[in-house]
UniProtKB/Swiss-Prot annotation:
Its EC number is 2.1.3.3. The gene is argF. It catalyses: carbamoyl phosphate + L-ornithine = L-citrulline + phosphate + H(+). GO terms for cellular component: cytoplasm. InterPro entries: Asp/Orn_carbamoyltranf_P-bd, Asp/Orn_carbamoylTrfase, Asp/Orn_carbamoylTrfase_sf, Asp_carbamoyltransf_Asp/Orn-bd, Orn/put_carbamltrans, OTCase_ArgI. This is Ornithine carbamoyltransferase. It comes from Agrobacterium fabrum (strain C58 / ATCC 33970). Its main location: cytoplasm. Carbamoyl phosphate binds at S54, T55, R56, T57, Q81, R105, H132, P133, C134, Q135, C262, L263, R290. Belongs to the aspartate/ornithine carbamoyltransferase superfamily. OTCase family. It holds the Pfam family OTCace. It is found in: Cytoplasm. Pathway: Amino-acid biosynthesis; L-arginine biosynthesis; L-arginine from L-ornithine and carbamoyl phosphate: step 1/3. Reversibly catalyzes the transfer of the carbamoyl group from carbamoyl phosphate (CP) to the N(epsilon) atom of ornithine (ORN) to produce L-citrulline. One of its GO terms (biological process) is L-arginine biosynthetic process.
Length: 305
């Protein structure tokens, strides 16, 4: 039996495959809006495991699988009790007998890896505490819709060194953009992601000054200062205040720079209303493109592209 095609991290999928997924996502978006989209996954079932609650991830994967012709099965963390009542390996083997693919959103990256190690069907990373690759696929798709090829462009991050940033860092090596980051002291991204990107051709630069990171950028990205279920890490929002994306900071970037945020946004904290509701903001295009990018991730994993 051939090994399943998992989508665990950008570092685990080659650049050609990532580009194939994005090309397919663009085509599926057009076909969906035209009412001509095919349904290649009729009769297929996607299990969705949510140890960490979500609106966008659940809805986008559910709707996406249905648009592909398949069905979904929602499993909450309390229902699954991964690694408690039963080993994760055994759960993976059992689910593989019932469904055709598994998406998991978890607070522990090791659970994702263990699930994929034992599953005989594709496993998709819907988000972990370490990475969020599906979000970056949607973000690159969105950037290229508005500004053309991302290769050679500069994407600037300001805020916390979190899971979304880790995937952006990996993406710099996979898609060829320059990644600049500004984070408070002590909130830096993990070295393993930085080192991997540098060793694989990524151009990355880390600052503790938002003005330096954003200067001349083609896109400015931020996220909530404290992620869900990580409130214990909060050391006072005052340390993040200099990293707020406001009109003054956006003025440091290119005049036509885009603003991105994976949502939900804490307005008045990491971003002001003037920016998120302004003409440079594409946050709702990002949210929509989660649907289309993830459809193509599912299709790639299941061998129909």
């Amino acid at each position: 039996m051939a090994s399943p095609k998992h989508f665990l991290d950008l570092s685990a999928v080659g650049p050609q495959d990532l580009r194939t997924i994005l090309d397919d996502a663009r085509a599926r978006k057009v076909a969906t809006k035209a009412g001509t989209a095919e349904k290649p996954l009729a009769g297929k079932m996607l299990a969705m495991i949510f140890e960490k609650p979500s609106t966008r991830t659940r809805v986008s994967f559910d709707v996406g699988m249905r648009q592909l012709g398949g069905e979904t099965l929602f499993l909450s963390g309390t229902e699954m009790q991964l690694g408690r009542a039963e080993t994760i390996g055994d759960t993976a083997k059992v689910l593989s007998r019932y469904v055709d693919a598994i998406m998991i959103r978890t607070t522990d990256h090791s659970r994702l890896l263990e699930l994929a190690e034992h599953a005989t069907v594709p496993v998709i990373n819907g988000l972990t505490d370490d990475t969020h690759p599906c979000q970056i696929m949607a973000d690159i798709m969105t950037f290229e819709e508005h500004r053309g090829p991302v290769k050679g462009k500069t994407i600037a991050w300001t805020g916390d060194g979190n899971n979304v940033l880790h995937s952006f860092v990996e993406g710099s090596a996979r898609f060829g953009y320059r990644m600049t980051m500004a984070v408070p002291m002590g909130s830096e991204p993990h070295d393993k992601f930085m080192n991997w990107a540098r060793n694989n051709g990524g151009e990355i630069a880390l600052y503790h000054d938002a003005d330096k990171a954003v200067a001349g950028a083609d896109c400015v990205v931020t996220d909530t200062w404290v992620s869900m279920n990580q409130e214990h890490k909060a050391r006072g929002h005052n340390i993040f205040q200099p990293y707020q994306v406001n009109e003054a900071l956006m003025a440091k970037a290119q005049k036509d720079a885009l603003f991105m945020h994976c949502l939900p946004a804490h307005r008045g904290e990491e971003v002001t209303d003037a920016v998120i509701d302004g003409p440079q903001s594409v946050v709702f295009d990002e949210a929509e493109n989660r649907l289309h990018a993830q459809k193509s991730v599912i299709a790639w994993c299941m061998g129909v592209i």
